[in-house]
Amino acid sequence: MERFKKASSIIETLKQQGHEAYFVGGSVRDLIIDRPIGDIDIATSALPEEVMAIFPRHVPVGLEHGTVIVVENGEPYEVTTFRTESEYEDFRRPSSVQFVRSLEEDLKRRDFTMNAIAMTEEGEMVDLFAGQEAIQKREIVTVGNAADRFQEDALRMMRGIRFVSTLGFSLETKTKQAIETYGHLLEHIAIERITVEFEKLLTGTYCVKGLKELVETKLFSHLPYLQMSEERLLKATQYNWDSFETDIEAWAFFLYCIGEEHPSVFLRQWKFSNKKIKDIVAVLLTIRKRKEKDWDTVLLYKTGIHIAEMAERVYEAMIESYDHTSVERVQTLFQALPIKSRQEMDVTGNDLLNWASKKPGPWVAEMIQKIEEAIVQGNVVNEKECIREWLQECNLL
């Protein structure tokens, strides 16, 4: 409750000005579940302009949706006016937002009952839709009619399965049936929004359970490049996903599980950044080499420790080995390398030009590469004079 206490002065100030105000959303849910608290959000009957007038330190980030960031005790908090939403367009966004003075009207527009619980600054729960009961049963239940909620915003179906993965809850029967019925509406949603939810699914503590629900509800069949992947997705549920430390590893392992032959094409379709695509593909390529042989100095040097650590964790999951010392072994091998990058070489292209009676050309880069490999393999000490002597002995100068 300590973090809520820091924000309670905002609620107290709003109430002193004659407004209602409550803590709402995921932070309240996580408090009840006893999970780490993320962002703390506040809902109020005060209109955005009233909030800004009351709190001088504010940032008007989403006034059309009624949201103002209020800075209190050095921390930013989203303060959003109670609102209701009109008919939705394209199964993804409301055509308009109306500000209201009723907490109930605000809570009834939310996706799941566990996310529709409000809390006073004293810690008293305002639970109008049996959200605490759903949490006790470890069930994900929509607020009101599931068909209505999913037709309003089809991404809620993906969010529901993401919560299965992150919380370990189960989909309530009617909620699950509605996902099976309305899953096709997900095709109206921007892939960027789906990717965010899918990544949270893959990195969730109960990822295997989430993937099973993805298959059972047939929602996977409405996702890019996964339409024909039922058997492969089920294969993915047979592995242990607990050892991954990054989203890069989770995506690399997922692509391995579904047998994706063109990972770059898949990832571009899912709108990943070029940097992320590069890292995921690098992990997959490294695993391919790792399957052929154990780590040696050259492979480890060329791979780099960042990719090597991730590749080793994914490789261990692939072969269903739970030897937690394997990554430590990679780290030890890397630390023992004579150099960690080309920048650490005690020789430059200018040195080579001074030593050799040749004009500049491609031979300089080729020679640097030979020296680099020789240092990494331990054939020459990384000292300028030693390198010069080695070049002369090898008739390379």
From Swiss-Prot:
CTP binds at G26, R29, R110, D153, R156, R159, R162. It is an enzyme of class 2 (transferase). ATP binds at G26, R29, R110, D153, R156, R159, R162. The keyword Nucleotide-binding applies. InterPro entries: Bact_CCA-adding_enz_type3_sf (IPR050264), CCA-adding_enz_C (IPR032810), CCA-adding_enz_firmicutes (IPR023068), NT_sf (IPR043519), PolA_pol_head_dom (IPR002646), PolyA_RNA-bd (IPR032828). The keyword Cytoplasm does not apply. Its EC number is 2.7.7.72. Gene3D superfamilies: 1.10.110.30, 1.10.246.80, 1.20.58.560, Beta Polymerase, domain 2 (3.30.460.10). GO terms for molecular function: ATP binding; CCA tRNA nucleotidyltransferase activity; magnesium ion binding; tRNA binding. It catalyses: a tRNA precursor + 2 CTP + ATP = a tRNA with a 3' CCA end + 3 diphosphate; a tRNA with a 3' CCA end + 2 CTP + ATP = a tRNA with a 3' CCACCA end + 3 diphosphate. NCBIfam families: PRK13299.1. Belongs to the tRNA nucleotidyltransferase/poly(A) polymerase family. Bacterial CCA-adding enzyme type 3 subfamily. Catalyzes the addition and repair of the essential 3'-terminal CCA sequence in tRNAs without using a nucleic acid template. Adds these three nucleotides in the order of C, C, and A to the tRNA nucleotide-73, using CTP and ATP as substrates and producing inorganic pyrophosphate. tRNA 3'-terminal CCA addition is required both for tRNA processing and repair. Also involved in tRNA surveillance by mediating tandem CCA addition to generate a CCACCA at the 3' terminus of unstable tRNAs. While stable tRNAs receive only 3'-terminal CCA, unstable tRNAs are marked with CCACCA and rapidly degraded. This is CCA-adding enzyme.
